[in-house]
Amino acid sequence: MQVDLLSSAQSAHALHLFHQHSPLVHCMTNDVVQTFTANTLLVLGASPAMVIETEEASQFAAIASALLINVGTLTQLCAQSMCAAVEQAKSSQTPWTLDPVAVGALDYRRRFCLELLSHKPTAIRGNASEIMALAGIANGGRGVDTTDAAANAIPAAQTLARETGAIVVVTGEMDYVTDGHRIIGIHGGDPLMTKVVGTGCALSAVVAACCALPGDTLENVASACHWMKQAGERAVARSEGPGSFVPHFLDALWQLTQEVQA
């Protein structure tokens, strides 16, 4: 199993494309992370929109550059809105990304996410336990937390990618991105990133945005992981703990975009 590493040049090129195209991202995400997710997209140059009302979700999915479905605070009403948006995204050829939060621990959301897979997501982003559960290999995880190493989920990610046609992202100490054949590994980040709510969910939104960019989607999605890990490392170096990490993280993402444009 060969794992390729993403080059700095590939990451910088993707970030330039991101800023150039400024994707409009329809974020149907969980209630806990909306502000952090929106700010992450904004500082990178995207336009976030948190449209969840069932009567509007389908309409907005047709005009957005990309759609994110995050089931972190799933309710039956949210599920109806998400289904409407996904169906419209498929009809409009809008790329959409699934973040199957805690799918291995809870039956209702697992059934819902499996139903959504029939609509062929462009990308799927989760931790090792979530990806393994979605692939039907194991049910696990401790709520939103993983109990498996990212590398252990690579076979499940490849299987899921081949079955759905999606690019699958497994996040952890090292991130892995695969289309079922190629695998790209991304080093970096810091354990402090796991002590702040929303870094993974925000990454899923950036992944969704990257699916709307031209070029190699696998490399663009892998670049999203690289930006987040790189910003995390920079932020940790300036932070005293989780409380000061978040503003430093947003500043670090902003600085990455400025460096690419310089």
Swiss-Prot record:
Its cofactor is Mg(2+). Substrate binds at residues 50, 198. Its EC number is 2.7.1.50. It comes from the Bacteria. One of its GO terms (molecular function) is hydroxyethylthiazole kinase activity. Coiled coil: none annotated. The keyword Zinc-finger does not apply. InterPro entries: Hyethyz_kinase (IPR000417), Ribokinase-like (IPR029056). It is an enzyme of class 2 (transferase). Signal peptide: none annotated. ATP binds at residues 125, 171. The keyword Iron-sulfur does not apply. Keywords: ATP-binding, Kinase, Magnesium, Metal-binding, Nucleotide-binding, Thiamine biosynthesis, Transferase. Belongs to the Thz kinase family. Catalyzes the phosphorylation of the hydroxyl group of 4-methyl-5-beta-hydroxyethylthiazole (THZ). HAMAP family: Thz_kinase. This is Hydroxyethylthiazole kinase.
